[in-house]
């Protein structure tokens, strides 16, 4: 059967990509990705040109079905020139450098498989990447992984960058237990209610937030637990990387004084002082 590689990509600094990730991206047949434009730019930076299949949160289940069909296809069934319709299908499923493969191309691969049985031929290999970081960690990927595994294919992790572990490595947190919460609800009432629950557990927790809502999140945190300890990372691994450490009140005052916050934010919140 085929193999799905779940590949972590840099969260900012492209030099953080691993040698193993590059090797996999160079050798797979198709790269499924959250945003084809961003992934095409990433691959082009490293001189890699592959077929791209869109697999975003809103179409992940549909994309998973297409990719499973692809993973079940012997490579030679649609890459080797054959007579008649099989030859036409083989030509049409070849992608030009950087070309995106849509439903029609994958369907042609399935049609070619139905026309002939190739014993002993290796099956397709697919890589999945999110826009940045590790797929499935507050990013699409979980639906695809479950579907591919349930279909009997192999799923292989290719570890690498993650905003979660990047922040933890420089936070200096001593807590043995750290809860990863990810993104809270954008709804103010639900967000504050969840913060009340999290702070009541007296366990360090990690949040992700967009630059557009981080000030509101900090205001809610101050209302719930103003003396809680916060490490806020912004633009991690990028040129304007910033770490802000202090009480929730101090960090909020620092950020609310700005007219505009740029870059994704990661927050570690703890009752214990760092």
Curated annotation (Swiss-Prot):
GO MF annotation, one: rRNA (cytosine-2'-O-)-methyltransferase activity
Keywords: Cytoplasm, Methyltransferase, rRNA processing, S-adenosyl-L-methionine, Transferase
Enzymatic class: transferase
UniProt KW Protease keyword: no
Annotated catalysed reactions: cytidine(1402) in 16S rRNA + S-adenosyl-L-methionine = 2'-O-methylcytidine(1402) in 16S rRNA + S-adenosyl-L-homocysteine + H(+)
GO cellular component: cytoplasm
Major localization class: cytoplasm
EC number: 2.1.1.198
Compartments, as annotated in UniProt: Cytoplasm
InterPro entries noted in UniProt: 4pyrrol_Mease (IPR000878), 4pyrrol_Methylase_sf (IPR035996), 4pyrrole_Mease_sub1 (IPR014777), 4pyrrole_Mease_sub2 (IPR014776), rRNA_ssu_MeTfrase_I (IPR008189), SAM_MeTrfase_RsmI_CS (IPR018063)
Function recorded in the entry: Catalyzes the 2'-O-methylation of the ribose of cytidine 1402 (C1402) in 16S rRNA.
Family statement: Belongs to the methyltransferase superfamily. RsmI family.
Name the record gives this protein: Ribosomal RNA small subunit methyltransferase I
Organism: Treponema pallidum (strain Nichols)
């Amino acid at each position: 059967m085929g193999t799905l590689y779940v590949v972590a990509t840099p969260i900012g600094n492209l030099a953080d990509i691993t040698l193993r990730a590059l090797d996999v991206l160079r050798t797979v047949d198709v790269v499924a990705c959250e945003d084809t434009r961003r992934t095409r730019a990433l691959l082009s930076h490293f001189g890699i040109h592959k077929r791209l299949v869109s697999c975003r949160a809103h179409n992940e289940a549909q994309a998973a079905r297409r990719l499973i069909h692809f993973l079940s296809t012997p490579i030679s069934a649609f890459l080797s020139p054959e007579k008649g319709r099989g030859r036409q299908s083989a030509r049409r499923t070849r992608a030009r450098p950087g070309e995106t493969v849509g439903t029609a191309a994958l369907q042609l691969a399935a049609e070619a498989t139905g026309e002939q049985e190739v014993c002993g031929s290796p099956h397709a290999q697919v890589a999945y990447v999110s826009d940045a970081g590790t797929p499935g960690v507050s990013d699409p990927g979980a639906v695809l992984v479950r579907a591919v595994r349930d279909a009997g294919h192999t799923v292989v992790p290719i570890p690498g960058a993650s905003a979660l572990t990047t922040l933890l490595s420089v936070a200096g947190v001593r807590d043995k237990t750290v809860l990863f919460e990810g993104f809270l609800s954008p709804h103010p009432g639900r967000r504050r209610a969840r913060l009340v629950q999290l702070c009541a557990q007296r366990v360090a927790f990690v949040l992700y937030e967009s630059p557009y809502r981080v000030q509101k999140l900090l205001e809610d945190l101050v209302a719930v637990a103003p003396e809680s300890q916060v490490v806020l990372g912004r633009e991690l691994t990028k040129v304007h990387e910033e770490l802000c450490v202090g009480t929730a009140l101090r960090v909020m005052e620092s950020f609310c004084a700005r007219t505009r916050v740029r870059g994704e934010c990661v927050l570690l919140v703890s009752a214990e002082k760092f």
